[in-house]
UniProtKB/Swiss-Prot annotation:
GO molecular function, one term: shikimate 3-dehydrogenase (NADP+) activity
Domain of life from the UniProt record: Bacteria
Binding positions (shikimate): 19-21, 66, 91, 107, 230
Descriptive protein name: Shikimate dehydrogenase (NADP(+))
Cysteine pairings via disulfide bonds: none
Keyword Amino-acid biosynthesis listed: yes
Residues reported to bind NADP(+): 129-133, 228, 251
UniProt similarity note: Belongs to the shikimate dehydrogenase family.
Keyword NADP: yes
Enzyme Commission number: 1.1.1.25
Organism in which the protein naturally occurs: Prochlorococcus marinus subsp. pastoris (strain CCMP1986 / NIES-2087 / MED4)
Amino acid sequence: MITSKTSFLALIGNPVSHSLSPIMQNAAIQYLGLDLIYMAIPCKNEDLEIVVNSIKKMNCKGLNITIPFKQKVFDMCSEISPVAKKVKAINTLKLNDNKNWIGTNTDIDGFIYPLKNLNLIKKSSLILGSGGAARSVIQGLIELKLSKITIISRKRNSLNELITNFKNDIEIKGLLSTNNEIKNLIQETDLIINTTPVGMSNTTNTDELPFGQGFWDSINSKTIVYDLIYNPSPTPFLKFCDKKGCMTIDGTQMLIAQGAKSLSFWTNGLEVPYEVMHDALKEYL
């Protein structure tokens, strides 16, 4: 029951109307018996600083930050975790005793969750896309001790930036999507991760595969294919790879695991029920 003493958690982004976070977070909150409510707050770019700073003065226990603000909140934090600094993205904020924001990133934990029991040590990986999500993926692969990473993108500048940021941590290279090496790489790689929005619901390329279907003719049935998109589930890319005999993973587990890690962060280490969050999403969808 919501009372005058109920505290709140919120997701800040633009847009947020598609978000599933309130469904799974409120299910976990209810299960744990916490006097909290989680909601999504849309925010215009020009209003971000006003909104985030105003919330500090309310009965708020923490925030999730999503696109397009994961880098823009850095200047609003008095303390930032090492992992958030490394991937240059914050997705979770919590107020300290002085009512200042502490920023961290739980996307890495979320990304790792469905992979941690697959023994990927010394394996090779291919990342599709060089945007913000690729940073968390690279950091996660480093923590899983893979041997090398190749990033495929249409954008040379962002490729170079990622390589510069991570070249001291793992063997990493970037290729433009037109490179002739890619066909052989697709055939030989152990793990492929899609970080692009291609195939996502409510986009102009809902039915497409990253870089086009012909790009994937050489894919090997032994390859694990992981698409960070969770709506639709499965994506056209995962359907295609499943027909090729690949093991496939959608973004649902990452979504839940990063959310559980955020809720644990806000509640000072409370054990959060993954299955409760999963069941709530399954029922909703």
